Amino acid sequence: MRRNVDLTYIVMNNQIYGLTTGQLSPTSLKGMKTKSTPFGSVENPVNPIPLAMVAGATYVARGFTGQQKHLVELIKGGIEHKGFALIDTFSPCVTYNHDNTHEFFKQRTRKLEEMGHDATNFQAAMEQGYRWGEVIPIGLFWQRGDLPTLDQLEPVLGDGGPLAHRPLGVAPELARALVKELM
C-alpha cells in the first residue's frame, strides 16, 4: 500500500473463515464463538479501513453486498483511481456467522455520502473508519490523488511494461547454449 501500486484490492469481509468450517478470521469480533474458539475470541479484530489508511492506501472504501449498486460504484471508483485502492466489502457468511448477518448490516449500514462526509479529510475518515455499532458507515472514506504511483516513480516499470512481456534480448544461439548447459 505504501508504494501506491496502481491496484484495486477488494476484501471479502465476512468476519469468519467459512471455507474452513467457521474459524475466526482477522476481522472476527472479540468474543465471537466459533468451532475453533468455543469460549469466544480473545483478540481485537483488525479494522481494514484505518489499517489501509495508515499503510498509505490512496483510495479506501467499504461496501455491503446487500447494496449492490452502491458497491459497484465503489469498485468502479477504485478501478478508475490511479493508485492503491482498498475496498472492504461486507459479505455475510450465511452458514457460520450468525451474529453479523445480512439483516444486521442492512439495519446498521449508512452511506457516508448521505452523512456529508469529506473523503479528503484524513482525520474525519479515520473517525468514521473506527465507527461500529448502531451505525456502520459504508462508502468512500478516504481518497488522495496527488501522490505518484510506483510505476511513475520507478522508471524501469514504465519502460515497456512487465519484464515477462518484453523481448528476451538474448541472441538465439546464446539462449540455446545456456539451456544446453543447464540440462
Please state what every model-predicted region is.
Residues M32-G77:
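Conserved thiamine diphosphate
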Residues M1-G18, H70-E73:
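Thiamine diphosphate
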